[in-house]
Every structure is written in structure tokens, then in C-alpha cells.
């Protein structure tokens, strides 16, 4: 039964009288919110004699004089019961007046909190710029991080926009990830390395949809190598018969290539490229949460994302917290640009087995040829006082092929001489939730074979395939465990190219040791045999056949071939001794490199549990 208007008026008048007269509530009083579920108590009356109820009224309280009676009687609250349809009165007493005050105060507080919740909820739905102040021990940094082009947070922060960083940004952006790229200098870089992309690297470029980045930059096709030693030469062509005509190596200006990749990445609507120098990673409870960086205006900012990928190159200042860097600098490259000259073998890289170490020539445009002279050790002749020019003219120029001699001397006289240390660093990661290392910041090898970009692009393909099934990267711990498989899955390509680069550099460098001289000559003669003896090693070098076991077999085949040359036609004790040292020297070259790369990961990856880890389960 519902309450009518007259009854509600009675209820209001009754409660008002209680507060006006400061009348207390009875001990039996209880405030009930559901009027359909109450216990009924008889209301005590002054006259115990039953009063006659007027016709048409359900109870005495519904009579014409009920308002007057309610006022004259002790104050009470009228309740209705839907179950019985009868009305009863509950007397108010003095003990629990404070309880009612508490109920009213609690109701007001709850209403205020509800109002705040509704306002905050509606406000959070609006796209906005997040602006937060972070206090540190030394200063206060003002972070003004765009929450995404569509008001959404960032999925991935990429530190560095070189070959690895730019290619990764485009790849993840194409997969729908929201990417924030921070690059120290967005102008076109000017480097003397990273200018030759092997055919295996070009295939990865095609797989990532970036093959047009080698167009419109005057890039030159590279079809193989030419090897020179003591006036003799041999041509080693890439085994490209099974591939499309466009598949080959490419050589170009590194800066032009990188700028094309940056433009391609920045064209994605969900990729934001910003100029800024990252100074540190932001760590919280062992998990990387983002980066702290300085803008070109000098403002200190912070950016946050569930995954931070560091690709800041060979001079990385962030790698120490993510890996165990063991950087070796076996030599330096001295770079020159030769103009208006023709290479002995068109569209081929040229390797001269000079004394004391190799010299490289390869085209970087339709009119220019890059020359890289390897100088062993970390100390090179001074450029400023003319020592370098004198060294190049007197020591190097006589060993340059006659077709290039004049152009080489002219390049030295022009004086545009550059140097670059050649770094080697095996991949030795420290898996850290929320962060990953890639590119030269993670793994380097001697640039003699031009395999760095091939390894970087191959790593991006592996990482792309691992991340593709994931909806988001918010569970840093689960993501970190899952991505441990990356370090093993990358090994076939990376370890093959790394090991070959380190081994070839040591074999191609001259040495006073007779066994090393024999090994060097045996390598040149082995590759000159043609057939499988040349296509096998070249397929390894080009990234077309990344098989570590095949590399080891060819390497020791060269050593055995060298021993055979020593023992035939008539072996002698001296020759046998040199042969034994040749085998020992070959083992001393390749086994330390394999150990650094990881024997189990190179040859027995199926025995590593991380390879079989499934993607984290989405909630």
C-alpha cells in the first residue's frame, strides 16, 4: 500500500515536531530504508479501550482527526507494510537522536563523494594533454607529454632514429602501436659506415615494407665482391639465381638512407618523431617505466610507456643498465670519397688484402666510390699535422689497384679524411622488464663484411613477429619473460654474420707468423676455386644462408685446404709443424668468437626453454 499526500504530511509534521521540541528517540527505534520490510509494534495509547474506527478508514490513524491526535500524542513515525497492509506507529525516544544526526551527516558525505566521482569520470573521458610535475633530489622536472595524437597513451618509446630505430618505428606503427621516437639530431647524419646493405638485409627491408627507402637516393646495386691479393684478383658473386631481379645488395650514402626511413616512419599517423637527447631510463621496482630526456630547447621532460626500446647506436650511454658491454676496438677505419672513377668490377665491393690490414672500395653513388682503409689498433696517425696524408700516400697508395690509384691520391690531397673506430661487442643481455636493446647499442661486429644493417633489420623482423599477437604491453613482467625468446630466435642470422666478420678480419689481416700467412693465402685460394667453395661462404656473408654450422664447416675446410697445400707434394717436418700451427691458429680464431656468441644458442637453440614460451594470456 502506498502513502497518500495526507499521510506524508503527517510524517513530515511528526519529524519536525521531534526536532523542534528536542524530543528523544525511543530505544526500539530503527531507521529503515525499505518500507516494505519492517517489524510492526503496537502503539501504546492513553486509553486502553478500543476506539471505534470510522467507516472507510483502514485504521484509526486514517480518521479525519488523525493529524490532531498525532500532534497531541507522543511523536512517532508512520510506517506502511506492503505485506500486511496495516499501519503501525513507532515511538521515538531520547537515546538515539545522535544516531539520526550521524545518518544525515553520512548521507551528505556520500553525496559529495558521488558528485566528485561523476565529475572526475566525465572529465577523464576528454582527450587532453597530461601535465605532471616530478620531483627529484636535485630539481623539479616539468613533464608535458602528449598522450598520443588521438589522446591515447604511448605503447612504445624508441630511443634513437638510426637504421634500427627508424625501421622499428615504422614497423610497429604499421602494426597499430602508438610509438614515440626520440632522436638526438634529426638532421641528415654524415657517417662513413653503414653504407652497404647485403642482399639478406634487402630481403628483410622488403619484408618490412621499406624497400622504397633505397630509391631516389642514387643507391647502387651490389652483385658481389672482388678480392685482390698480390696483384691477383677473383670475383665472388652473390648466389641470387633463385631471387627476383631486384634482389641484390645496395650501397648508398648512410645519411640519405636514414632520412628516407625517418620520413617513412613519421608518415605513420601513430608515430611521433621528436628531437631530444635521452639522458636516463626511468626505473621503478626493477621495471623500466620510460625515459628522461632533454629537448632541443634545453627543457627536461619525461616520457612514459610500458615498453622502451633503446636503439641509440654504437656510442650508447644507456646500454650499461640493460646488458654487460664488452666492447673491443680492434682497429679504425679511415674514410675517403673517390670521385669520377671506375671500379675494376662494376657493381661489386672490392676487398684488397693489403699490409697490414684490408682496404675496401664500394660505390655510394653513380659518381662516387667510398674507400675505407683499416688501421689496426686504436691509435691512428694525426690528420691535423699531415701524418695521416703521408701514411696514406706512402703505405696505402702503392697497394691500391692501378685503376683506382690516381683517384685515391687525389682524394687524399683534397683532405676530406674521416676516421671511425671499429667496435665489436657480443650480445650479452640483462633481461629487464619494460626495456629492450637493439641495433649497435646491443650487438656490434667488425664492419669489414658490412653485416650490421642486415642483423638489425633481421632483429626487427623477429621482434615484430613476437609482438604481433599481443594486444598491449602493460604486463611488464610477463612481457619480459616472453621476450627472452628474442635473444635466441635472432641467433641464426646474428651469430653467423658476427662470427664470419670477426674471423675474416683476423684471417685477412697480415701477420709475421708463418702459419697465419698460410691461412690468409689458403683463404684466397679456397674462394678462388669457385662453385660451392665460393658461393657457400658468400651466401653466409650476404645473409642469404644464415647457418652457423655451415660457417664452421667452411672455415675449417679453408684450414684443411691450407694444410693440404703445405703437405703436397712432399711433406717435411717443418711444413707439418706449420700445418699443425695453422689448425691451432684457426681454432684460436673462431672458437673464442663462438663462445662469446653462445654455443648453445648458436647450435642447439631447440634446447632453450625460452624459445617455446607462448604470448602472455590477455585478461
Predicted feature descriptions by range:
Residues 164, 187, 279:
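Conserved Rossmann-like nucleotide-cofactor binding loop
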Residues 381-487:
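FAD/FMN-dependent oxidoreductases across multiple families
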Residues 93-106:
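Feature marks short, highly hydrophobic, charge-poor N-terminal signal-anchor/signal peptide-like helices
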Residues 145-164:
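Beta1/beta-strand and adjacent pyrophosphate-binding region of the FAD-binding site
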Residues 109-125, 409, 465-619:
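C-terminal helical "tail/cap" subdomain of flavin- and related membrane-associated enzymes
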Residues 157-159, 173-193:
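Glycine-rich FAD pyrophosphate-binding loop
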Residues 280, 286-287, 292-431:
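Conserved FAD-binding catalytic core of PHBH/FMO-like flavoproteins
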Residues 151-153, 203-206, 211-321, 327-335:
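Conserved N-terminal helical subregion
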